[in-house]
Amino acid sequence: MRTELFDFDLPTQNIALRPVSPRDAARMLVVRPSVPLEDRIVRDLPALLAPGDQLVVNDTRVIAAQLTGRRIGRGLEPKIEATLIKRLDGARWQALVKPAKKLLPGDVVRFGHDGRVCLLGHLDATVEAKGDAGEVTLAFSFHGPVLDQAIAEVGATPLPPYIASKRAPDAQDIADYQTMFASNEGAVAAPTAGLHFTAELETALAARGVGLHRITLHVGAGTFLPVKAEDTSEHRMHAEWGTISSGTAEALNAARAAGGRIVAVGTTSLRLLESAARDDGRIAPFADETSIFITPGYRFRAVDMLMTNFHLPRSTLFMLVSAFCGLDTMQAAYAHAIRTGYRFYSYGDASLLFRNDITP
């Protein structure tokens, strides 16, 4: 499909720079097939679900993946900004760096020159390899948990570019950009649909008889990358690591067999569930990378409903929701959201989507 079909105009005033408080007070647009759009709030979620339905959340935790440092060892020391995007082993990360032209294989970057100090000593990284799009492989001077601690001390929260271009990250983002489920470190972007949940909402869902299950997909920086191809068939999707335990898979399969619906909280949860689904719709245990790219025409096997934020024009995530509900339906839903002042992107409002081939 032509990627221009997934484009739309978004006024800058619709882009949220801070979340609402409390989190479950965010607006939520309910999109059902052949039913008028409905404006609700996230706190209404229990009333929109049925006993036996099963929510699936992503429990990944965002690391302090934004590092600032300087190249050392060969004359002038230019400032280097690095965003960690994929862990390769105990000491090596793949990263996006700016300005990439200032680095060559063999160069050493010392991070912490913005005033942050690593108590364990200098956090140095050697450039092992360099790609064509600003990607480098960094071999750090620390390893394993020691490296994790050093990154936490020196790094900053990696806000999405559409927020970071308008304001600098601050202490409030450390809390705001983590979900209440965040427990497994490894993401460089938050699974933002989960940001809407509160302890009170979780209690109300349990009282309604709705189950809640945790899976892990470590969200990569590729989630922010624009689709530059003119046709969806030409786009290469980024890979991310995910896990679904055997116990979770069994519980979801049993609930669905009993008539419960699987409700993915966020596109990351949906992509992982669909990656683990068999042709018969049963979910298998999973521990691997996934680069699944969902566009209109995809046959959903595991997920019946999707709670998700509002996404960028011409993005893989808008393509995904268009596959879930239909392109015309989602273009109309987004036009309504823009016209009525919904807040977009990571800190924005939510939508609750019913799959277009299932009668609500």
UniProtKB/Swiss-Prot annotation:
Protein's name in the database: S-adenosylmethionine:tRNA ribosyltransferase-isomerase
Catalytic activity of the protein: 7-aminomethyl-7-carbaguanosine(34) in tRNA + S-adenosyl-L-methionine = epoxyqueuosine(34) in tRNA + adenine + L-methionine + 2 H(+)
Primary enzyme class: transferase
GO cellular component: cytoplasm
HAMAP family registered for this protein in UniProt: QueA
Disulfide cross-links: none
Family of the protein in this entry: Belongs to the QueA family.
Gene: queA
Keywords carried by this UniProt record: Cytoplasm, Queuosine biosynthesis, S-adenosyl-L-methionine, Transferase
UniProt EC number: 2.4.99.17
Coiled coil residues, start to end: none
Short name of one Pfam family: Queuosine_synth
Domain of life: Bacteria
The organism of origin for this protein: Rhodopseudomonas palustris (strain TIE-1)
Biological process per Gene Ontology, one example term: tRNA wobble guanine modification
Gene Ontology MF: a single term: S-adenosylmethionine:tRNA ribosyltransferase-isomerase activity
Subunit description: Monomer.
Compartment(s) of residence: Cytoplasm
Function text: Transfers and isomerizes the ribose moiety from AdoMet to the 7-aminomethyl group of 7-deazaguanine (preQ1-tRNA) to give epoxyqueuosine (oQ-tRNA).
SUPFAM superfamilies: QueA-like
Known pathway: tRNA modification; tRNA-queuosine biosynthesis
